[in-house]
Swiss-Prot record:
It comes from the Bacteria. The keyword Protein biosynthesis does not apply. One of its GO terms (biological process) is antibiotic biosynthetic process. Pathway: Antibiotic biosynthesis; actinorhodin biosynthesis. The keyword Zinc does not apply. Gene3D superfamilies: 3.30.530.20. It comes from Streptomyces coelicolor (strain ATCC BAA-471 / A3(2) / M145). InterPro entries: COQ10_START (IPR005031), START-like_dom_sf (IPR023393). Keywords: Antibiotic biosynthesis. This is Actinorhodin polyketide synthase bifunctional cyclase/dehydratase. Pfam families: Polyketide_cyc.
Length: 316
């Protein structure tokens, strides 16, 4: 039962997918940016038996919001409960649960939110945002769980680490994506807007949030346009989420992490198996798609880093 001043909304969806598979997908919070459309980035802060604490950045009503949550995971009852520890206005408190109720006809997924608002006038907007994001999350979860292939074949992560003359200079090169059309031969045009995060934990308060639209030239001479949200922490990291992934993917996110003289480029992708043959040709498999993505995305990151290293000049 909700406490005084607290409100409850419940979203449900039935699926033929097994309950345990659905539970395990929700439990893997690191994969959320590649699976759930609203989620931009997740940083795990603590993890212990049956509990974890993480910071999340997500798009809510077209803006990027951040909060810190603690979760309890029960693999026996297939239940995940959560509670926000650090909220942002207009939310005063937020918690809830994921439940997966299997029966002979499939599984009912139940996503519950209990929340209170700083100002009651904000309630309609909060309900609208919860309805929109919860609907997207349930649809994406069920779509992935109902695939014939195991989720671990479709969602995977890979990374490359390269040495550079200066990690700080490499950060400056990659952060200034508005100059890429002058610096990278495959980039035709970049449109960039940015704003300071301004809120959240002290260690990320100097973060900037970038909205980047980029037009690139493909190997066959055509053009391809992508749009990404990027979270930039000076000299440390740039994480990103593609809002409209390429045709082969249902989700794509990644990160650039900078050391003193190294940069690591990481990609997490979710393959759309229904598009594999359309993109790669008749008879192509998910395994072929994994190889293709590893080669193409990895090559793009390495090429960007080589240009960044060249711009920085030789190591002193």
């Amino acid at each position: 039962m909700s406490r005084p001043g607290e409100h409850r909304v419940v979203h449900t969806l039935r699926t033929q997918a097994p309950a345990r598979r659905l539970y395990e997908l929700v439990a893997r919070v690191e994969d959320w940016p590649a699976v759930f459309e609203p989620t931009v980035h997740v940083q795990v802060l603590e993890r212990g038996p049956g509990t974890e604490r993480f910071r999340i950045w997500a798009r809510v009503g077209g803006r990027v919001k951040t909060w810190t949550s603690r979760r309890t995971l029960d693999p026996d009852t297939l239940r995940v409960t959560f509670r926000q520890e650090l909220t942002q206005p207009p939310i005063a408190s937020m918690g809830g649960s994921w439940e997966f109720r299997g029966d002979g006809d499939g599984t009912e997924v139940v996503l519950t939110h209990d929340f209170a608002a700083v100002d009651e006038a904000a309630l309609p907007g909060l309900r609208e945002a919860l309805d929109a994001n919860s609907g997207k999350e349930l649809a994406a979860l069920v779509a992935l769980a109902e695939r014939r292939q195991p989720p671990e074949e479709l969602v995977f992560t890979f990374e490359d680490t390269l040495r550079v003359p200066s990690g700080d200079d490499a950060y400056a090169f990659i952060e200034r994506s508005d100059l890429w059309q002058e610096r990278l031969p495959h980039v035709r045009k970049v449109t960039l807007t940015e704003e300071a995060a301004g809120t959240g934990p002290a260690e990320t308060r100097d973060m900037t949030v970038q909205d980047m639209t980029m037009e690139t030239v493909t190997t066959d001479g055509g053009t391809h346009t992508t749009r990404s949200i990027r979270l930039c922490v000076p000299a440390r990291s740039i994480v990103y989420k593609q809002l409209v992934p390429p045709a082969l993917l249902s989700g794509h996110c990644g990160a650039w992490t900078f050391g003193e003289d190294t940069v690591t480029a990481r990609h997490t992708v979710a393959i759309d198996p229904a598009r594999v043959e359309e993109v790669l040709g008749k008879g192509a498999t998910v395994a072929d798609a994994r190889t293709h993505l590893r080669e193409v995305l990895g090559a793009n990151s390495r090429a960007t880093l080589r240009h960044a290293a060249a711009a920085a000049g030789p190591a002193s």
